Amino acid sequence: MNKELEMKKEIIINRIIDFSFVLGVVLVLFPHFSKDYIPSFLFPFFGSDKVLSIYPFFVFSLFSLLLLFLKKEYKKLLFIMLACLVFCFGFFVIAEHGLFMIIDGVTQYDVEKLEGSRLSFFNIVSRLFDSKDLSFRLSISEGLFALYSAFNQFKEIILVALLIGFIYKERFDEAKRLFFIGIIISFILVILYEIIEFPFLWGSEWSLKIQETINPFFHEVYRDGSWWPPLIWQDNVLRNVFAEPSFFGYYLGFTTVAFMHLLINNKHKVLWSVFLFLSYLFAFLTNSRSGVMLVLGGTFVYCILFAIKERKINYILAILLILALAFAGNNYVVRIKEKNGIVTAYSPIEKTNTVVSPLDGNVFEVLKASFEPDDIVDSSIVRTIKTVFSLNARSNTTRYGCTFAELSIGLNNPLLGVGELYIGGYMEPALAEAGFSNGELDVWIQSQKQNGVLNNSFASFNAFTSTFADGGVLGFILDYGLLFSIIVAYIILFFRRDGFRGYKISIMLFSMIAIIIAWGFSNSLQESYLYVIVLGLALSDLLSRGRLLKHDETKV
């Protein structure tokens, strides 16, 4: 009787876990959701976080921990506790070290510039230790805030990834199925939004009005008094429900790899071909350098690994054909926009009063022109990719300037860095030493002077150099130790004779991890919760593989 009751409990808990997992995958579409529509009572524990996936994965984490406890998996629970302690203590040391390096220059003016939870911690500490000097009170409050921030980061990233790995180790096939369900549902939502957004590329007024109405739900428009994210992206490109086109491109990098896997390994190949085509087309129409590069890079990695391990060229040719059709479709859309006189980031045409429908009589001429060699050589996509390597193109001066400055700061403080909260005070001399300067950087420098040494007014464009500058080698290991351990495990697996053969899901996950690494060189990895989900699935893949090998099985 007790066993039956325990089994029923486990079944119910697993269903809650699975539902939370699928919902979390679907909600990766909303990494900057407006906090006006999130219950305020959640803010103290979640820090008013606008990444919607965090909330279902919090439920996932609670019930996963409960399941491990009921199954008496005490070693795993102890491992999680020790990992949390090491993670939090490590970032506490980094924060205290960073504050110690600048404490002599901190004034009351700097303290008055503190905001949010940092200010709350300082006020509480000041009441408890009102007789102590400023340096003492600040060191206590900043240390407490570092522990608070580190714990939140651990429970939202490391804990979720570990629990996905542990919980789905025994039923990895179910994890794969749930992941694809979540991706498919999210992509259907993307398509539904594109029914509204796509006509805007041809100057549709009704499309504009609908977007103006619904976009404030998806992200906080003009957040904190800045221009970003705007209500409507003025470059006449796709961004869907995301705050900017590059974030949409990041998401599409994952969907292209997922749909390649489904096309090759599942039925309904026409459906997956259409979804793959749309993923490519949407990515091209974002006109995002990083988005296009991620989609093409993910395709390249997947096709190379598949060709080496599976030796089935026909599928690769099918994928390349779909890619070529999407490329032509992009050029067709661009030509229609040019005929409409719509000014875009890559189409400097003067505005006219003539609106051309994509279904006009000249559709075949336009489509034919989309395949012309001259058009391909000088297409918007090629021009977009070229700007990645130009120092003066778009935001590259700012991007490369901050990246080289962070690298310099990290090399000068290699062990513990300078502290995430205090790096702003080091940026101006580092930028000057690297020889980077422009109007945007000058604005941040002036803002840094106004906000004081306890704040950081500079944006980060490279997750790895930023982490290295903030926390040195220790911070890098704490943040990315799990990620690079999984990469090493997959590489070792790849070079085994039977490596990925039969493990096609490993090819997909490794390709997604390659996308994550590439994205990290231009943005924060946390811009999409797919980072955490893919880490967890990869860990589950590796753990389940080890379990199966013990039983002399060879397939996942």
Model-derived regions: residue spans:
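Alpha-helical transmembrane segments of multi-pass inner-membrane proteins
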Residues: 154-163, 177-235, 239-309, 513, ...
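Loop-to-helix entry and N-terminal half of a specific, functionally important transmembrane alpha helix
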Residues: 19-27, 270-278, 314-318, 454-462, ...
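A membrane-periplasm/extracellular boundary helix in multi-pass inner-membrane enzymes
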Residues: 97, 198-201, 306-391, 408-412
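Aromatic-anchored transmembrane helix interface
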Residues: 50-58, 108-167, 178-181
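Helix-loop-helix junctions and helix-breaking kinks within/between transmembrane helices
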Residues: 35, 50, 96-97, 148-152, ...
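Transmembrane alpha-helices of multi-pass inner-membrane enzymes
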Residues: 23, 60-65, 299-300, 314-317, ...
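Long extracytoplasmic/lumenal interhelical loops at the membrane interface
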Residues: 389-412, 416-474
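N-terminal signal-anchor transmembrane segment
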Residues: 2-107, 530-537, 542
